[in-house]
């Protein structure tokens, strides 16, 4: 399962808000909504976020194993 938890940690560490992503950097509010709900994003979006946040992919997402219930 993909988690965007590192993305929110990176935002906090870089002192960047979602508002700034949208209005200062022109990032899509729809993509932020998708990420909040654990939906897929494109590699192009990952590349854009890495550029804005000056981080690697592991600063945006992480993979965790799903537990069988």
Predicted regions and their residues:
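Short alpha-helical DNA-recognition segment
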Residues: 15-33
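The alpha-helix within a helix-turn-helix
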Residues: 11, 22, 50
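Residues within the helices of the helix-turn-helix
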Residues: 8, 19, 33, 47, ...
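Short, basic-rich loop-to-helix N-cap that marks the start of a DNA-contacting helix
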Residues: 39-51
């Amino acid at each position: 399962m993909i988690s965007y938890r590192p993305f929110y940690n990176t935002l906090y560490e870089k002192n960047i808000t979602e508002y700034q992503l949208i209005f200062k950097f022109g990032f899509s509010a729809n993509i932020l909504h998708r990420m909040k709900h654990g939906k897929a994003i494109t590699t192009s979006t990952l590349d854009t976020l890495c550029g804005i946040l000056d981080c690697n992919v592991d600063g945006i997402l992480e993979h965790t194993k799903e537990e069988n219930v």
